[in-house]
Amino acid sequence: MSIIDNRKATHDYFIEDRYEAGMVLEGWEVKAIRDGRVHLKESYVIVRDGEIYLLGMHVSPLPTASTHIRPDATRTRKLLLKAEEIRKLIGKVEQRGYTLVPLNLHYKNGRIKLDFALGRGKKLYDKRDTAREKDWQREKERVLKHDTRVNQRDS
């Protein structure tokens, strides 16, 4: 079950490989995420010291959060992957033009997982081409739907 999607990711990047990772979270973060108080829009994934981290994910603390801790809404969160996957990702990210983009948060066996992808940034003309292609598909579906209704009525 998906918690939140980063819809802007597919608009801004060509998605090549998808990965799923666990995250190191604190208790108050898990409660807030389960309550839907999370945003992925400005977040990104980086490689630092041979490990992979998620930066910029905003988790708004619940008003009932404990008073003895100071929740940091945008703290850096470590992603949990196998060493082989990390090595493979580091090799790909070091190539020119590749980046790691968070796609969505979801539950898997009661745990919160992050789907992220290896992607290349789209240029403005690529975004226009994608939009044009979507419009064409939508128009084609509309015409076919309308055409089949007319044919059924005539029969």
UniProtKB/Swiss-Prot annotation:
One of its GO terms (cellular component) is cytosol. It is found in: Cytoplasm. The keyword Mitochondrion does not apply. It holds the Pfam family SmpB. SUPFAM superfamilies: Small protein B (SmpB). Keywords: Cytoplasm, RNA-binding. InterPro entries: SmpB, SsrA-bd_prot, SsrA-bd_prot_CS. It comes from the Bacteria. Its main location: cytoplasm. CDD domains: SmpB. GO terms for biological process: trans-translation. GO terms for molecular function: RNA binding. The keyword Ion transport does not apply. Belongs to the SmpB family. Required for rescue of stalled ribosomes mediated by trans-translation. Binds to transfer-messenger RNA (tmRNA), required for stable association of tmRNA with ribosomes. tmRNA and SmpB together mimic tRNA shape, replacing the anticodon stem-loop with SmpB. tmRNA is encoded by the ssrA gene; the 2 termini fold to resemble tRNA(Ala) and it encodes a 'tag peptide', a short internal open reading frame. During trans-translation Ala-aminoacylated tmRNA acts like a tRNA, entering the A-site of stalled ribosomes, displacing the stalled mRNA. This is SsrA-binding protein. The gene is smpB.
